[in-house]
Each structure stands twice: as C-alpha cells, then as structure tokens.
C-alpha cells in the first residue's frame, strides 16, 4: 500500500519536542525526511543516553523515538562547504520543517 506522503521530501531543521514530533509524523506517513544536525549532533541525542534501559548506541530513547524513519546528515553551517551542502539540500527537498 502506498503511503500518503510517498514522494514528498522534507528537510528537518527541528529540535527538542514539537518540531521533531511533527516531522516524525511526516516520516511515518511516508515522507523522505532528512534531519540536518550540527556536526556534534543534535542536543537531544544525549537525553537518557547513559541509561542502558533507555538507550541504544549512545542515543537516548527520546531521540530515537522522535527521529525514527528519518535520514540524518551533520552539516557545519559555519563553513563555505557546509553552507553549499545545505543550499543543495534545500533545493532538492522543496519542503522545510523548522522550529
């Protein structure tokens, strides 16, 4: 069965709760969702990361849950190369989620 948002590409610049939750729903509905993070990773990666019952591979359950079904790329927007990559991502995505 084809998903409702199959063929839609979203560039996800969100962090914390409401933004990642919204883009999680888009990804769950079939949108190709590309999360853009700083080179050191988005801050919520570490929430619960030290709890073995609530973490996997250094990422907490909070981050894993809200970012399921998404692709991820780390970009340093302070460099010329990083900014060029970001502009390329914006061009191919056509849809942007940010909070």
Where are these regions (language model features)?
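N-terminal helix-loop segment corresponding to the beta1-alpha1 unit
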Residues: 1-99
């Amino acid at each position: 069965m084809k998903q409702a948002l199959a063929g839609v590409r979203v560039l996800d610049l969100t962090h914390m709760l409401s933004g990642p939750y919204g883009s999680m729903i888009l990804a769950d509905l079939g949108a190709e969702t590309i999360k853009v993070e700083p080179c050191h990773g988005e801050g919520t990666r570490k929430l619960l990361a030290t709890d073995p019952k609530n973490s996997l591979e250094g990422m907490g359950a909070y981050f894993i849950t809200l970012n399921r079904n998404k692709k991820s790329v780390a970009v340093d927007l302070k460099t010329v190369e990083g900014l060029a990559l970001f502009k390329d991502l914006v061009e191919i995505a056509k849809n942007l989620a940010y909070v």
